[in-house]
Amino acid sequence: MTQKEAIEYAINLAKKANENEIRPNPFVGAVIIDHEGQLIGEGYHQKLGGPHAEVYAIDQALQKTSDLSQATIYVSLEPCSHYGKTPPCVDLIIQHKIKKVVIASLDPNPKVASVAKLMEHGIEVEVVDDVSANLLNNRFFTNQLKNRPHYILKLASTIDGKIADYAKNSQWISSVASRQFVHDHLRANVDAIMTSYKTLVQDQASLTIRNTGGAIQEANVIVIDKNLELLEKQYESLPIFYPRSVTKIIFIAANPPSIQLPENTACIIGTFNEQGLVFSSIAAKLLELGYYKILTEAGSQLNSSMIQQNTADELYWFIAPSILNDLNAVPMLGLDTKITLDKKVQLSLIETKLIDQDVLLHYRFN
């Protein structure tokens, strides 16, 4: 097995994990190749608090040989060197005198710093900085480097960039298949769905997760509601207030509530300006609550505000094969700003996908 093949193998192993089972940890895969180029051990991180990829790979390799001093371990992410829920993987690599460690992606956590420790013990280290490995853990990197949740922005529009008609009717622009994709691949794989109270009132949304078989699953919902207007009696029958057993509605408001909050709800106090919520004011609290990855499904103003504040990390844009051709229709982005081309927001395309007759463009923000 070549180095390129081993790295690709480790990355594909890492992808086997269910992110909901490992978050906030990253995806990690590891393979061990002996001096003859044969695969003798492999593994991936499967569950938060469970063994790391390197542990599985080394345990498997030791079933075939007691001597790993001529072996190379390939890891999709830099091995940990600090105590967390499990012991450091670096110590295990050193203990078994593995000859070489090839790292596809460095860990941004300053506590890790395993490269220096490995080299101090005479172990050869090579960092290849693989693009696929870096993309795999973009959520983890956001959490570590920016100390905030990783935000995914979801948009569904006509070809001319409209998300609703002049009367604010938006149901439905995208196809049934596209909407199911959102449930299966986006809502089901985040810690919470973020929206605004205006969107909930306008769309009468429940923001649940509906699988292809029709079963409905609860989802945590974060509602940006500066003045807690959604708590007014006229809105108490909105679909979002369905009985919850394992999830919560988190309100983000400018001031504490003056009334008792409904069951399974909580309130975070954030800072607001003329353009809405200042996202940095709630970042630490959301991480504290365990919301590491958040999907935003909202209107044009919130979409624009997130982009302007450099808060959006990924964009899933569903483009329907239709045109409204109306200046009065609701645009997908909606801040009244005058931006010159030199200040445009740059994105990188990750994937394009045809879903029924809709086009899905998946981007990351640079």
List PLM regions with ranges.
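Active-site beta-strand termini and strand-to-loop segments that position acidic
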Residues: 34-35, 146, 364-366
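Short conserved beta-strand segments at catalytic cores or DNA/RNA-binding microdomains
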Residues: 30-33, 155-159
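Structural preference for beta-strand elements that scaffold enzyme active sites
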Residues: 72, 150-152
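Zn2+-dependent cytidine deaminase-like catalytic core
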Residues: 36-134, 220, 307
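N-terminal glycine-rich anion-binding loops that anchor highly charged ligand groups
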Residues: 22-38
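Flexible, polar/acidic helix-loop-strand segments at domain edges
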Residues: 138-148
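Enzymes that bind and transform nitrogen-containing heteroaromatic metabolites
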Residues: 3-25, 41, 85, 150, ...
